[in-house]
Curated annotation (Swiss-Prot):
Keywords: Cell inner membrane, Cell membrane, Chaperone, Lipid degradation, Lipid metabolism, Membrane, Transmembrane, Transmembrane helix. Belongs to the lipase chaperone family. GO terms for biological process: lipid catabolic process; protein folding. It comes from the Bacteria. The keyword Protein transport does not apply. HAMAP family: Lipase_chap. This is Lipase chaperone. May be involved in the folding of the extracellular lipase during its passage through the periplasm. It is a single-pass membrane protein. One of its GO terms (molecular function) is unfolded protein binding. InterPro entries: Lipase_chaperone.
């Protein structure tokens, strides 16, 4: 992950879950969906609302209050509901991935072991003592295996978007990994997303074909769009809107917009709650960057003091613990330190 003081770029984190479009296979995490409602159990509707497809959701009384020890990046939010089928088993639904992606939003705050423990707690909060709890834990381990396999790809699977052959290979490779690690969960987790990515790639192949005239390209694009199911067309419109919002956030950051200015402009695009969350992220990023810069200066003084490696490392660790007191901050700072060390 590229870091600005140890966090993913703001435009990436502004959308809470769901990797979408060709940006996913290019290694850019564009989080789709609305921001999580503070104090609710869903991204949009009431936590008691039925899950799509007539599936039941875990009993609402099992939900953990939003204030119950959430990582900083999820403060004031609640996890999505885990869907159940009529027999009480975990339903094979994209909503299960949404739950895990929500939890993964906290990975910059937590070590791998702490993230696992957090997911276990969040699952238990909804499904404790049920067969669905065991099933959800199994799917989590499968999903982690999928993500670990992606991370082991060359450049974490990132490819040159101008190379259509490489994009096609990346899509096929990710689909293979998903099926190998997730089994029959690969379709509910990634089926619709993979369809959209292949659709986007087909569009690119048409628009970049030098043998076609503009009229021929328009004709083929129109024919391709007609192949898209109505629900996919609606989903594509949402994705386009989300991409536009991400671009807007990036432009506002590039222009040096203040949190208040960013909030005012994004309110018109994302709504007041999402805009407020993005503005808060910007403030958090600025605060973190300032503290890490001060810490790095003090660390450099220790490194230049001529201490033995053991004493030097002990003093840097103590400094890190003094400066970064919130959960996960010291781990993130240590990770940045290692990155800075390898760069040197």
């Amino acid at each position: 992950m590229t870091a600005r003081g140890g966090r993913a770029p703001l435009a990436r984190r502004a959308m809470v879950y769901g990797v979408v479009g060709l940006a996913a296979i290019a290694g850019v995490a564009m989080w789709s969906g609305a921001s999580w409602h503070r104090g609710t159990g869903a991204a949009s509707d009431s936590p008691d609302a039925p899950v799509a497809g007539g599936l039941a959701a875990a009993p609402p009384q099992a939900a953990v209050p939003a204030s119950a020890g959430l990582p900083p990046s999820l403060a004031g939010s609640s996890a999505p509901r885990l869907p159940l089928d009529a027999g009480g088993h975990l339903a094979k639904s994209r909503a299960v991935r949404d739950f895990f992606d929500y939890c993964l939003t906290a990975q910059s705050d937590l070590s791998a072991a702490a993230l696992d423990a957090f997911v276990v707690r969040e699952i238990a909060a909804q499904l404790d003592g049920t067969v669905a709890q065991v099933e959800a834990l199994d799917v989590w381990h499968r999903y982690r295996a999928y993500l670990d396999a992606l991370a082991k790809l060359r450049d974490a699977g990132a490819v040159d978007k101008s190379d259509l052959g490489a994009l096609q290979l990346a899509l096929d490779q990710r689909a293979s990994i998903a099926y190998r690690t997730l089994g029959d969960w690969s379709q509910p987790f990634f089926g619709a997303e993979q369809w959209r990515q292949r659709y986007d790639l087909a569009r690119l192949k048409i628009t970049r074909d030098p043998t076609l005239t503009d009229a021929q390209k328009a004709e083929r694009l129109a024919a391709l769009e007609q192949q898209m199911p109505a629900d996919e067309r609606a989903a594509q419109k949402r994705i386009d809107k989300q991409r536009a919002a991400i671009d807007q956030i990036a432009q506002l950051q590039k222009s040096g917009a203040t949190p208040d200015a960013m909030r005012a402009q994004l309110t018109q695009t994302l709504g007041p709650e999402a805009a407020a969350r993005v503005a808060q992220m910007q403030q958090d990023d600025a605060s973190w960057q300032s503290r890490y810069t001060d810490y790095a200066a003090q660390r450099a003084q220790i490194e230049s003091a001529g201490l033995s490696p053991q004493d030097r490392d002990a003093q840097i660790t103590a400094l890190r613990q003094r400066v970064f007191t919130k959960p996960g901050e010291a781990v993130r700072a240590a990770s940045l330190d290692r990155g800075a060390g390898s760069a040197r």
